[in-house]
């Protein structure tokens, strides 16, 4: 499944709508998506939304749509 993650780049500063960023990632469920972002970034997650159907098709039309991947931390 594809998830849209809205976040702030910093966990210290209070969230502001004007500074909210977005990333897209593929994960098995919303918990796995949150874990991936929390384990690999310092971001303050505001919202994680599953994208399906028309919502996914709409987001894919954006030139900013790109799936984010994280390197595995397995040794």
Swiss-Prot record:
The name this protein carries in UniProt is DNA-directed RNA polymerase subunit epsilon
Tell me which InterPro entries the record gives: RpoY
Q: List the disulfide bonds.
A: none
Q: Single Gene Ontology BP term?
A: DNA-templated transcription
- Catalytic activity as recorded in UniProt: RNA(n) + a ribonucleoside 5'-triphosphate = RNA(n+1) + diphosphate
Q: Name the gene that codes for it.
A: rpoY
Q: What does this protein do?
A: A non-essential component of RNA polymerase (RNAP).
The EC code for this enzyme is 2.7.7.6
Identify the species of origin: Lactobacillus johnsonii (strain CNCM I-12250 / La1 / NCC 533)
């Amino acid at each position: 499944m594809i998830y849209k993650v809205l976040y702030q780049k910093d966990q210290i500063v209070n969230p502001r709508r004007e500074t909210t960023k977005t990333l897209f990632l593929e994960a098995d469920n919303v918990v796995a998506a949150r874990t991936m972002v929390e384990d690999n970034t310092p971001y303050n997650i505001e919202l994680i939304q599953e994208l399906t159907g028309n919502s996914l098709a709409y987001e894919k039309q954006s030139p900013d749509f790109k799936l984010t991947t994280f390197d595995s931390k397995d040794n």
